[in-house]
Amino acid sequence: MASSSLANFLSIFTPFKSPPPQPTKAPPSHLSVSTDSSSNNKSAFAPIVTSNNSSSSSSSSSCSGDLMSVVCPSLAYANTLYFRSAYNVQVIVEDNEPEEKLLGRFRREVMKAGVIQECKRRRYFENKQEEKKRKHREAAKRNRRRRGPFRNFNDDKTESVNKKRDDDNDNWEMPEDSPLN
Amino acid sequence: MAKAIPKKGSRGRIGSRKSIRKIPKGVIHIQASFNNTIVTVTDVRGRVVSWSSAGTCGFRGTRRGTPFAAQTAAANAIRAVVDQGMQRAEVMIKGPGLGRDAALRAIRRSGILLTFVRDVTPMPHNGCRPPKKRRV
């Protein structure tokens, strides 16, 4: 894949800069710092599915990017120039993939990235009150899922133990070597 | 006052030249809003080859936003380029809307080889203030 993409880029781009004095091993991290939860930047190289939000590079070929930065430094980042658009989700289609499977995969990735939710939220302005309410609801939903099923069994036990520990730390009694004892 | 247009051979005939252009690989942009779906087929650089939308397919009003309309729009757009010889394509989907899945399905069914399917919905990093809430 590295060689074919190299050939592709050689035909389109002529090396426009002389090889830099020190070839860097890692591809440039044009990772934009974003506060949104939907634009998570997982740059793990999964051969089938990648979901990314990078401003100039697609890390689906991060592996070949590393290789190319060693082989031909001036063209190592040609990939980043090629895929200039930032995307939220990318799904690489294999050969002869059934239609439903592709759609299911795409939909799942989009849901994981939260694109549609985010879009709906940003359609109209929400004031601070609305935002607080929404965050509260989201937090409740997240915590409920994680801690809900376990709570019913261990609730009383942990609570009582905690209470005891709190009392112990409170220093109600005089220290043992005090003259008053 | 007449501007001196430099005479180049291709300039005068660029209209007819474009229609003959054959592109083996292209990009299909799907813009799926809540009220409509627009499907544009371009080459890899972004120059538009053909486009179609739910509105141009004859649907009007609320029916434009339906997934079936998106399906017909995609089929229309693809039909125009398949005879131009496009085999592989990337798909870029933008916007929320019901047309996303339906158009993707139609593209898949039309027999074009897909390489990537990407979602390029523009996300502000808390930029412009959106319009006020609707009180309906």
From Swiss-Prot, chain B:
One Gene Ontology CC term in the entry: ribosome
Subcellular compartments: Plastid, Chloroplast
GO biological process terms held by the UniProt record: translation
PROSITE patterns listed in its UniProt record: RIBOSOMAL_S11 (PS00054)
Organism domain of life: Eukaryota
Coiled coil start-end: none
Keyword Ribosomal protein in annotation: yes
A GO molecular-function annotation: rRNA binding
Pfam families: Ribosomal_S11
Signal peptide: none
Keyword line: Chloroplast, Plastid, Ribonucleoprotein, Ribosomal protein, RNA-binding, rRNA-binding
NCBIfam families: PRK05309.1, uS11_bact
UniProt xrefs under HAMAP family: Ribosomal_uS11
Family named by the database record: Belongs to the universal ribosomal protein uS11 family.
Assembly information from the UniProt record: Part of the 30S ribosomal subunit.
Protein name: Small ribosomal subunit protein uS11c
Organism per entry: Guizotia abyssinica
